[in-house]
Amino acid sequence: MAQTGQLQIAHDQDGSRERLALSGELDVVTAPALDAAVERLLAGRVESLILDLRSVSFIDSSGLRSVLTAWDSCREAGCELLLIPGDGACLRLFGITGVLDDLPLWEPKSGDGFAQLDLA
């Protein structure tokens, strides 16, 4: 697990899906860590990437830029991106900025390997 400033990024895998689970603040200071983590995964030819934002307590425009950049990078790499926004800061910002309906949102079910966030 990587920790930068007030952001923790955990990486795990379930079958063909890779997950980056974020916890803390996604802002101008910490967004580059997300950019780097996505870039590292995509260099390994990932088929499906889940960006789990349920435990993000704060996100600013830099964090939004990183999420949108991850989406673009995944499309360019032929990788499916699934976002789990949770019901907090990320969902609010996505709605306010008008990107909510465009983003590839995903809600894990109880049988999915990523149903629960575990950053312990």
Positions of PLM-derived features:
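STAS-like cytosolic regulatory interaction modules
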Residues: 1-57, 68-120
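Conserved G/P- and acidic residue-centered "switch" motifs that form tight phosphate/ATP-binding loops
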Residues: 60
